[in-house]
Regions:
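Glycine-rich phosphate-binding "P-loop"
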Residues: 70-71, 170-172
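Class I S-adenosyl-L-methionine
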Residues: 1-134
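Switch/connector loops and helix/strand junctions flanking conserved nucleotide-binding motifs
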Residues: 164-167, 205-207, 236-238, 256-258
Length: 283
C-alpha cells in the first residue's frame, strides 16, 4: 500500500472549489473531471480551513474559537506530516486494527500499513465523503462518535478529536469532547491496546484541579507519556500559537504482572529536525 504524496506547500482552497469537489464526489465524476485523489488529499481542508476568520484578528485563541464554533464544528484536520510522524513512532504492522474515532478526511489512514484494517467515524458528511473516496478499503461510517459501536476491538486508536466542545452525558454530567474521546477509546481498545491522542496542552495539566479526570483516565489506562507539539503544528488549518500535546496511553490488562503506570503532568518537548515537514509550517 503506497500512501498519497504530500506536497511541500498545501494550497489554500476556496469554498467554491470545495463545492465543486463535493459535487464531483456525489456524482462519482472526479476522474472524468481530471481531479485525482492526490488533488483532493492536498487541497481539501474541511470546515477548519474554510471559516474565513483569521486568528490574528482576535485577542486570544478562546475568542477566535468562540467565533469559529458559530460556523463549524471545531474541525481542524491533522496535518499529514504530523500524522506520518505519529504513525511512524507507533511502528504499526499490517495486521494491527487501527481506528480514528473522529477521522475527518482520514489523514491518519494515508500512512497506515494496511488500509483494510483502518476504521473511522466522522460526523461531517462532506469530510466523510472525502475519506471514503480516498480510502475505499477502509471501514468508514458517517455518524457521531457517541453513537459509534463497531463490532470489533482495536490494537490502536489514533486521534485529534474536537477541542473544548462540552457534551452532556446520559447521567447528566458534562464532559469535554477530547475527554470523551479518550474514554470511548478505552471501551474500544483491546487489553494493552494503545491510544495516541492530540489534546490541548491544558488537558490534565494540573494534578489538583484535574484530579477527578486523572483518576478517570487511570482507572482505564496505564500512562505511557506525553510530548508538547510545535505551536505552529496546525498553522496550515488557520490556527497558529495554540498549545497542544500528544499523549500516549495503554489500556489496562487484568494480568497480575501488569502494574499500571500512574499519570504525570510532566510533558517533554518533542525533538523534530529543522528540515522535517512538521517544522516547515512555521515558515
Amino acid at each position: 500500500y503506497l500512501p498519497m504524496k504530500v506536497v511541500a506547500e498545501r494550497q489554500e482552497i476556496s469554498p467554491k472549489y470545495l463545492e465543486q469537489i463535493l459535487r464531483l464526489l456525489q456524482s462519482e465524476a472526479c476522474e472524468q473531471a481530471g481531479v485525482t485523489d492526490e488533488d483532493i488529499f492536498n487541497r481539501y481542508t474541511g470546515d477548519g480551513g474554510l471559516h474565513g476568520l483569521r486568528r490574528s484578528d482576535y485577542e486570544n485563541y478562546n475568542a477566535f474559537s468562540a467565533a469559529k464554533k458559530e460556523l463549524e464544528n471545531g474541525q481542524f484536520f491533522t496535518p499529514p506530516p504530523l500524522c506520518e510522524m505519529i504513525v511512524s513512532a507507533l511502528r504499526l504492522t499490517d495486521t494491527d486494527l487501527v481506528a480514528d474515532l473522529t477521522c475527518g478526511m482520514g489523514n491518519f489512514f494515508n500512512f497506515l500499513p494496511n488500509e483494510r484494517n483502518a476504521y473511522g467515524c466522522e460526523v461531517d458528511p462532506n469530510a466523510c465523503a472525502v475519506a471514503r473516496k480516498l480510502y475505499p478499503q477502509a471501514h468508514i461510517v458517517q455518524g457521531d462518535i457517541r453513537d459509534y459501536e463497531p463490532q470489533t476491538h482495536f490494537d490502536f486508536v489514533l486521534g485529534n478529536p474536537p477541542f473544548h466542545l462540552r457534551w452532556i452525558m446520559p447521567d447528566a454530567t458534562v464532559m469535554t469532547s477530547h475527554q470523551y474521546y479518550c474514554l470511548k477509546a478505552a471501551k474500544l481498545l483491546k487489553p494493552l491496546g494503545i491510544l495516541a491522542v492530540i489534546v490541548p496542552a491544558s488537558f490534565l495539566a494540573d494534578s489538583f484541579s484535574d484530579k477527578g479526570a486523572i483518576r478517570m483516565m487511570e482507572s482505564r489506562f496505564s500512562f505511557l507519556g506525553q510530548v508538547m507539539l510545535p505551536e505552529h503544528a496546525f498553522s496550515d488549518s488557520g490556527v497558529d500559537g495554540f498549545p497542544t500535546k500528544l499523549q500516549f496511553w495503554q489500556k489496562k490488562s487484568t494480568a497480575a504482572d501488569r502494574a499500571p503506570k500512574r499519570y504525570s503532568t510532566d510533558c517533554a518537548d518533542i525533538y523534530i529536525p529543522s528540515g522535517h515537514p512538521v517544522m516547515a509550517a512555521s515558515a
